[in-house]
Amino acid sequence: LIMTASLLTACGNNFDERLKDEAEQLTKKHCPQQVDDITTLDSVVYDMERRTYVRYFTLAADAVPVAKENRLAVKATLTDELKNDASWKRVKDEKINFEYVYRDASNGTLAFTIRLEPADYQARQ
């Protein structure tokens, strides 16, 4: 997703505050955002206390059962994308957690959550 240069180059504020502000701006400017045929990004927040960058999605109702069934494959895909996305380098260097929360479009209930921790996305040494 979009990561503006201001996060990576801003001075003065502490990193967590900048990341929180960046998430709020992303939500205001770009959400909701259609990610693909079945997924909409609703909002992004940064939980400073948990040091977790959270993305909230809505899944098309007919896609929820298949997505839930393939949750491990979804996690693997998200992990690979994060590992290979250089724009998140500074955030990953700070050992931030990433959380992906998926809700059912038909009723708003939680479908599932995927959490990636530094051990998931950092290269094995």
Question: Model features per residue range: what roles?
Answer:
Residues 12-15:
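Bacterial signal peptide processing site
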Residues 35-61:
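Short edge beta-strands and adjacent turn/loop segments
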Residues 1-4:
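Sec-dependent signal peptide recognition
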Residues 7-10:
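C-terminal motif of bacterial Sec signal peptides marking the signal peptidase cleavage site
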Residues 57-61, 102-106, 116-118:
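A mature extracytoplasmic/lumenal domain signature
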Residues 82-110:
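A short amphipathic beta-strand at an alpha->beta junction
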Residues 20-40, 44:
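Post-signal peptide N-terminal segment of mature Sec-exported envelope proteins
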Residues 65-90:
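Short, non-transmembrane amphipathic alpha-helical segments
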